[in-house]
Amino acid sequence: MLCLCLYVPIAGAAQTEFQYFESKGLPAELKSIFKLSVFIPSQEFSTYRQWKQKIVQAGDKDLDGQLDFEEFVHYLQDHEKKLRLVFKSLDKKNDGRIDAQEIMQSLRDLGVKISEQQAEKILKSMDKNGTMTIDWNEWRDYHLLHPVENIPEIILYWKHSTIFDVGENLTVPDEFTVEERQTGMWWRHLVAGGGAGAVSRTCTAPLDRLKVLMQVHASRSNNMCIVGGFTQMIREGGAKSLWRGNGINVLKIAPESAIKFMAYEQMKRLVGSDQETLRIHERLVAGSLAGAIAQSSIYPMEVLKTRMALRKTGQYSGMLDCARRILAKEGVAAFYKGYIPNMLGIIPYAGIDLAVYETLKNTWLQRYAVNSADPGVFVLLACGTISSTCGQLASYPLALVRTRMQAQASIEGAPEVTMSSLFKQILRTEGAFGLYRGLAPNFMKVIPAVSISYVVYENLKITLGVQSR
């Protein structure tokens, strides 16, 4: 009689326990599928436990924390189908074998460059007969009990702009795999990212409003500090005033994300790449164009956000009242004040953010991605924080000028100024330091914003039925 005993330790058990299978009376082909070594080197046990947890999560249909025979067989069948599709996608020559060059090409398509020596190292980990190529059987045997479905898992694990929301809107959109696009998982990722952004922006809204106040009102004669800025806001409008401008800031997430995603998919076709995923410079071009289209579409909301953040108690009854008064007093053109420096800021922010993130990602993958492309929470948070900080630092002077231009009519007696004249005025009266007013609260919000958006994103993914990382 066909039977299989699967022992799964209780999660969090203190003692070191090994998972093992016992097969009795099984056909030879099933034995080859079910076999798993009992003796695991201690240094590999941490990775092994991660595999075990992922396998249980992937196959546990009744959510009892362990796999029964039927669940495990279903997991194997489903996983083998996916592995077959991946093998075919990697087999560029269609000869039934994968060599080092094909591995290098597949990773290059994802924007990850590795040497031939590194590709051969990957091959050796799977190559049983020493031919320096991998056939289907070797591929299947190596990956069947490893819940790593494909090399594009790098895309899955290393999503950037979808996961991390630091309040900026200039990042290059993330890539989505063919499977994610075909199954509709892409919109669930976007919804999870939008929800995470809403929570993150709301939690860091006081720092964001302080940044806007310092950008517009701080000067040599009015040296506004962080504590003084918070005190001034609370004294003028109470604690509730710390969240002025947050409503419109959250509201614009949905239309901007949707427009940027659709524009990015169209721009990818225009750049002329026939690959499933774009190379880095192609992503920068397509992402920057998509960002420009999205920003142009929702830019009036950016102006409203700045005006709402700067408003005094009782000045406007709400967003619609603010928009109506701007239209009546200043005309339609007022909704596009600061548009040029905003567009110019896309390239330095998106370019540096993407370049730094990809550099950090590639460095980690080349040095530490032995068994999985999963970097873990802290590596991902560190990479997101560093890349966002570098991008903001490069584009901050343009962001400051944009904000001052957006706020012009809200400052009594402020003359109309152009971008170039405003740059000259700031440099003449405040020096280069004046271009970085408000940078401190802006940097202070990066780490909490990244951390909060990541946690909320992961929880929303579970709610929306997106496969856990």
Swiss-Prot record:
GO molecular function: ATP:phosphate antiporter activity; calcium ion binding
SUPFAM superfamilies assigned: EF-hand, Mitochondrial carrier
Region of interest (Linker region), residue spans: 151-160
One GO CC term, this protein: mitochondrial inner membrane
Catalytic activity as recorded in UniProt: Mg(2+)(out) + phosphate(in) + ATP(out) = Mg(2+)(in) + phosphate(out) + ATP(in)
Membrane topology: Multi-pass membrane protein
Residue ranges occupied by any EF-hand domain in the UniProt entry: 47-80, 78-113, 114-149
Activity regulation (record text): Activated by an increase in cytosolic calcium levels that induce a conformational change of the N-terminal regulatory domain, uncapping the channel and allowing transport.
Keywords, ordered alphabetically: Antiport, Calcium, Membrane, Metal-binding, Mitochondrion, Mitochondrion inner membrane, Repeat, Transmembrane, Transmembrane helix, Transport
UniProt subcellular location: Mitochondrion inner membrane
Pfam families reported for this sequence: EF-hand_7, EF-hand_8, Mito_carr
Residues on Mitochondrial intermembrane side: 1-189, 265-287, 358-380, 458-469
Role: Electroneutral antiporter that most probably mediates the transport of adenyl nucleotides through the inner mitochondrial membrane. Originally identified as an ATP-magnesium/inorganic phosphate antiporter, it could have a broader specificity for adenyl nucleotides. By regulating the mitochondrial matrix adenyl nucleotide pool could adapt to changing cellular energetic demands and indirectly regulate adenyl nucleotide-dependent metabolic pathways.
Family membership: Belongs to the mitochondrial carrier (TC 2.A.29) family.
Listed name of the protein: Mitochondrial adenyl nucleotide antiporter SLC25A25
Organism: Mus musculus (Mouse)
